[in-house]
Amino acid sequence: MYVFLLFSRYKIFYVYIKKMAHRSRCNCNDTSNSNGSQHGINLPLRKIDTYDPCVNCRVKPHLCPKPHPCPKPENLEADIVIIGAGAAGCVLAYYLTKFSDLKIILLEAGHTHFNDPVVTDPMGFFGKYNPPNENIRMSQNPSYAWQPALEPDTGAYSMRNVVAHGLAVGGSTAINQLNYIVGGRTVFDNDWPTGWKYDDIKKYFRRVLADISPIRDGTKVNLTNTILESMRVLADQQVSSGVPVDFLINKATGGLPNIEQTYQGAPIVNLNDYEGINSVCGFKSYYVGVNQLSDGSYIRKYAGNTYLNSYYVDSNGFGIGKFSNLRVISDAVVDRIHFEGQRAVSVTYIDKKGNLHSVKVHKEVEICSGSFFTPTILQRSGIGDFSYLSSIGVPDLVYNNPLVGQGLRNHYSPITQVSVTGPDAAAFLSNTAAGPTI
């Protein structure tokens, strides 16, 4: 009797341990009984998205938390696959779905943070919810932002600057400082192709301004002569040193390499300018993209919760109502686009568990992955400079275009701190004729 009981208890214990061990390997989505009590497992089983495949269940059925064999991965297909749910991808997915019957799949490498206070609370940008040992901003947190490092900068002690990109549904609009800045028209008129000149796109800036409110009362702010003159000196020195100053030149000065002219003492400059007169470098339009709640608090308003919120997409990424032909798949890092000849036929991506998935494409693939990752995906897919792609081992070369991944121009925005004391401070601030040495 004692031997039998000992054996029975051992067997029960052995089966229980096997079940618990298997739970870490089986990804089956048991919706029939979420706590697994029918198998003697009292801890909740983690629910996963339905598109996530189940790993091989090679143990006996009675040891698996799911009472039936694991399903095969579903076959994904769409008319249009959009890669990247950032500022462009969210808008594109919304309007394509709203005004067509096309089946759309939107792939995003980051997570959906609609209920994450780190994203939704405007103060989350400054690290309000960080633990004490993580004194970093959201854009410095790899859970919310890509952290690609540039090549060493010989002009900055060979440091490798990091240019953060949003890693979330909403892209960088989910992690930025909530300032809206109207660009200077010179950049668009001098450097952008036909159809993208400032007057061509000005109407879109006007639409944005109609939808948001400035953080300050009124539309204008006083600036001192000292600030204006100091900035003009910086621009003049940049010109004399041969440094491009495209973003310091503006319409108001007739193309001269300085910023707004001073007049009538301290001038009044319109910061809410969509004519492109004000300089990107000199002035910011201090708009804050927020929604005020009934209790007086604010939440971040960004591309994700504006175009893909719960009115249009459910918590599992499936579209609702008119948007039922849209599917948003987050935590999906795109591997590459596959071609037959020069026609895109599928997109493969890797989920957060390392499983590889394929999406069949009937019409188009739209890459909305930003200025860094769009060329990266193209190159991995065999589109780019063949000599370079061959050197890094890209297997299938599709289209030879040496310009892919070249010609990036970024508005570099370093922070310079200067410490002066006594008479030097007054001279530094008042001697605008000579200006600071840079």
From Swiss-Prot:
Cofactor (UniProt): FAD
GO CC annotations, alphabetized: virion component
Keywords: FAD, Flavoprotein, Signal, Virion
Signal peptide coordinates: 1-26
Chief subcellular location: virion
Keyword Nucleotide-binding annotated: no
Signal as UniProt keyword: yes
UniProt binding sites for FAD: 79-109
Localization, UniProt: Virion
GO molecular function, one term: flavin adenine dinucleotide binding
Family annotation (Pfam families): GMC_oxred_N (PF00732)
InterPro entries, alphabetized: FAD/NAD-bd_sf, GMC_OxRdtase, GMC_OxRdtase_N
Family, per entry: Belongs to the GMC oxidoreductase family.
Name used for this protein in its record: Putative truncated GMC-type inactive oxidoreductase L894
Source organism (scientific name): Acanthamoeba polyphaga mimivirus (APMV)
